[in-house]
Amino acid sequence: MAVYLGMLRLGRLCVASLGARGPRTPLSRPWPNSKLQGVRAFSSGMVDCTNPLPIGGLSYIQGHTDSHLVNKTVGECLDATAQRFPNREALVIIHENIRLNFAQLKEEVDRAASGLLSIGLRKGDRLGMWGPNSYAWVLIQLATAQAGIILVSVNPAYQASELEYVLRKVGCKGIVFPKQFKTQQYYNILKQVCPELEKAQPGALKSERLPDLTTVISVDAPLPGTLLLDEVVAAGGKEQNLAQLRYHQGFLSCYDPINIQFTSGTTGNPKGATLSHHNIVNNSNLIGQRLKMPAKTAEELRMVLPCPLYHCLGSVGGTMVSVVHGATLLLSSPSFNGKKALEAISREKGTLLYGTPTMFVDILNQPDFSSYDFTTIRGGVIAGSLAPPELIRAIISKMNMKELVVVYGTTENSPVTFMNFPEDTLEQKAGSVGRIMPHTEAQIVNMETGELTKLNMPGELCIRGYCVMQGYWGEPQKTFETVGQDRWYRTGDIASMDEQGFCRIVGRSKDMIIRGGENIYPAELEDFFHKHPQVQEAQVVGVKDDRMGEEICACIRLKSGETTTEEEIKAFCKGKISHFKIPRYIVFVEGYPLTVSGKIQKFKLREQMEQHLKL
């Protein structure tokens, strides 16, 4: 089986699901006859400049712990960086022509945080941010943390039913969005859920379907029932409001929740992975250390980020790494654009480039690729999906990115747990997802017995450490099914570990589809297709694709006597589910491959579809 690379599995998780062995057993409950659980207390070790090794010939490894974890809030990190590098360029929003140094960014964030408090939001309230990459996104991310408000990262492609679910799930008190981006009309979509908005007093919405939602903030246009973001920020500049902010900050703790990022599993319903300041600050600090940022000059710390900010890769690996390490964050476009990413590297002298494999494929295939200047670029991060070894080699050779690193993680782990060192060899980068991060434990266990596997033997990858989320918002049972009392997080990924501690992801224990870095959950789509009046049953699988990694294939069995077409099924999807969830392939079938007990064998179904589609 091909090795899986670059897998920052944004949204991968382990939930209770019925499989051949029945319900998944939480890790805190002992497996039968288990003798080796990998339960080992953190001990002193080397700092993150040498390589920890597996212990005792078994698939257990512990990252170094001599460098201390940081007990600061996000706001304290921004304050410290602004004091240390006040005139260093902090943020460049190329498509909005915005440039701020760290002193200016801190001032703007303080005003925005003060403004949010002035309109009645308080510590612990949930505020959704819904839209493409923008200055407003970064501002709200940092301002909510500064005020103790919990940011809810909302996928900008969500349609009305998806938006309603996540806002209700976490009880959002407020939401921020632009009026429109491309064909996505945010205000009109929200009105489908909250028809009361149009006649509501700004800041005093009373919605039947979203009873917790009172405050709607528009980024760029005065709209009925909304507050304008500029006015909120302006109100925050008043001295009495800034004094209120300083008062509230005295009650913040680094262990407070700061961010809810939605992730899902084969059961289909999204769950809100809840992360604290401590989770995110330390993960971003350790990412930057692994990238050797503390030893770099300002000119060497210019990160080009074409990845979405609602994902961990963008918000933690991008924004927070910038805040903690004083790196310049360059947002190249509101949504991914390969040409704009190349222009940012060339014109802004970018030194690091983040991206998913699909993004890098598009960048390498730009018609005018050879006309861009790559003299400043030295490395970057590839994550989010399957990255073939040939792609890793092409990026390094064609883009001068000798310090490219492959990253693996999950939303529930803040997110990064394995990562290459920049100096790792080409073969080490092309053949693994790197080495364990500091202050993190990993073990690979037999899924039947729970015992540690021997080196180079596959099993389920489990993670423990500061990085593990606080839990799924409002779902203690699902949290326990994923993170037991012993705090081991079960990733659901099948992995192996070699003698040097390199981790290889060799498979998945669930049927999640990863299309161009987006996690697609088959059960969610299957439930959706069952709403079609002519559909008897639907099964969704991922089939291989050279560009996207995987594409969605819907295998549909129609009701007796009914007929429909591929085009009609796709038309049924538009406007009801996110564009990236609409299947590329629709195949009408008479039945599905089954086990003796009647369970559908999705791996066989996938094979059948790839043969049928001649992939």
From Swiss-Prot:
Function of the protein: Acyl-CoA synthases catalyze the initial reaction in fatty acid metabolism, by forming a thioester with CoA. Has some preference toward medium-chain substrates. Plays a role in adipocyte differentiation.
A GO cellular component annotated for this chain's UniProt record is:
mitochondrion
List residues traversing the bilayer: none
The protein's Enzyme Commission number:
6.2.1.2
**Which residues does the Swiss-Prot or TrEMBL entry list as transit peptide?**
1-49
User: Which keywords describe this protein according to UniProt?
Assistant: Acetylation, ATP-binding, Fatty acid metabolism, Ligase, Lipid metabolism, Mitochondrion, Nucleotide-binding, Transit peptide
Question: Which GO terms of type biological process are on file?
Answer: fatty acid metabolic process
PROSITE patterns reported in the protein's UniProt record: AMP_BINDING
Sites of the modification N6-succinyllysine?
182, 478, 544, 570, 599
Task: Point out the gene that encodes the protein.
Answer: Acsf2
Under Gene Ontology molecular function, one entry of this record is:
medium-chain fatty acid-CoA ligase activity
**What is the similarity comment for this entry?**
Belongs to the ATP-dependent AMP-binding enzyme family.
Q: Which residues carry this modification: N6-acetyllysine?
A: 179, 182, 199, 340, 398, 510, 544, 570
Question: Where found?
Answer: Mitochondrion
Q: How is this protein named in the record?
A: Medium-chain acyl-CoA ligase ACSF2, mitochondrial
Task: Spell out the reaction equation it catalyses.
Answer: a medium-chain fatty acid + ATP + CoA = a medium-chain fatty acyl-CoA + AMP + diphosphate; octanoate + ATP + CoA = octanoyl-CoA + AMP + diphosphate
Q: Does the keyword ATP-binding apply?
A: yes
Q: Where does ATP bind?
A: 263-271, 493, 508, 599
CDD domains associated with the record: FACL_like_2
User: Which Gene3D superfamilies does the annotation name?
Assistant: 3.30.300.30, N-terminal domain of ligase-like
Matching InterPro entries: AMP-bd_C, AMP-bd_C_sf, AMP-binding_CS, AMP-dep_synth/lig_dom, ANL_N_sf
